[in-house]
Structure formats: structure tokens, C-alpha cells
Amino acid sequence: MRTLRYAIVDVFTATPLEGNPLAVFTGADGVDDETMQALARETNLSETTFLQRATEGGTARLRIFTPAEEIPFAGHPVLGSAWVIARATPIHLIGFETGMGLIPVEIEREGGTLIGGRMTQPDPLIGPADVDVEELGRALGVPLIGEPAKAANGINHLLCPVADVAKATPDMQALAEYDVHTIYLWAPVRDGIMRTRMFSPLDGIWEDPATGSAAGALGAHLLQSGVVAPGRITMLQGVEMLRPSYIEVDVAPGEAPRVGGSCRVVARGEFQL
């Protein structure tokens, strides 16, 4: 019998039971792919991660699973997994070996207290979305106020501008026809905050409370299209799920987006297999 230890981390929040929950398994060397996938189904969170010994010069190898499949990269799994490592050791820079290469995460401390982390994401490929805007609006249950865009950073995103994300009433069957991992709604900044929502019918996720990969891709798109100036964008997601999540996205010309925030470990346990 083997014992596998894990932590549940609420990501993109400093408040327990908010943000996006993540299961992080430590010491996962030798765990086969089938077992990792089965554990991801068992935890039944949007993502579950497994930390293994590094083989390519990083701090650790990071495997990321949804309940349905392994994925090469996602934002909140990277940040939450880094938080678990940073709580255990006074490290300031973590390099995760992922399916998208080495992802660096800068650890932020204040007076020795862990307060946040900031990852440099893969630079997304961004282009126009060849879709019928009115039809997409009907599928979302809210009209678009501009042209959507597609972005890819290991995950494929459809970025959709709307006046008010809270008014969306998505038709998941219709949205699944767009064949992207995330459909990311965003509304113009108000009082310094940009509101977002994410739907992922292809992955069987009705809604996700915090989506770091989509937030980074959106930030890069908004800078590229002149909607925002270089600097930090604070995105608020998960409100409609009663799990508010604050995602900070730093964008600058010629640089990959940097995405960060805080986390909170809310549970620990073990599986005996």
C-alpha cells in the first residue's frame, strides 16, 4: 500500500473557501498516469497537480490533470503548487517543468511571511476569432460589445467582450461547438477592476472561479489591441459562484504576461492506495 499526501489550496485569494480550489499531491514520483488521472477524478476539482522530481534543471516537474485529461499548462495549478513548495522552504524562485516548458514563479514575502506568487506565462498566440458574433452572443445569453479574439498559450481561449458578465446565461451545448478549452468573458474596467467569467463545456466545467491562463492571455490581447496601457490589470472572477478571485496580470510590450495573486491552504490529507 502506498500513501500519497495532498493539500487543498484556494488560489487567487487570501480568504479561505474563496478563490479556485486545487488539489496538490507532493512526492508523486513513480505514480503512473492512470493513477494520477483516477485521483483527479476522485478529487473532482477543475485541476489536480502532482509534484515530481525535476529532470530538466527546474525545481520540480509539474503534472496537471483535469477530471478528464492531462493538460500541458494552466494558471491556478502553477500558482497553487508553487505556494505549497514555498510554505515548506524559504525559496524565492520556483521553476516548474511543464508540458509548455519551464514556467518560473517568483515568490513574494513580506517580513518573512509568504504573501503571493507571480508566474511568467507562455507568450500567447493571439488572432481574430472567425465566429458569428451574434450567434456567439445568443449562446452566451448576453450580446458582445466588440469582436472576440482567440488566444493560445498551451490552452485555447475564446476571449469575449461584454458589457456585464453577470448577465450571461450560457447555453453549454451551443458553446461546446466552439471547440476551445475556455470561453472567457470580460467587461470594461470599472473602479480599477475588470470583471471576468469562464465557461469550459469541452472539459465538463460549467464555470471556473479563477482561470489564470485565460487571464494572462486576455491581458496580452488587451495590451496588443490598445485597450489597456502597460502595467497591472486586476481581474475579479468567480463572483457568481460565491468564490471571488483576484487575478493580477502584469503586461508590458515585448514581454510575456506575468500572472499572480495570493493563496490559502485550507486542508491536508492522504490517500492510501
Task: Please describe what each predicted stretch is.
Residues 1-73, 79-273:
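Active-site proximal loop and beta-alpha junction motif in alpha/beta enzyme cores
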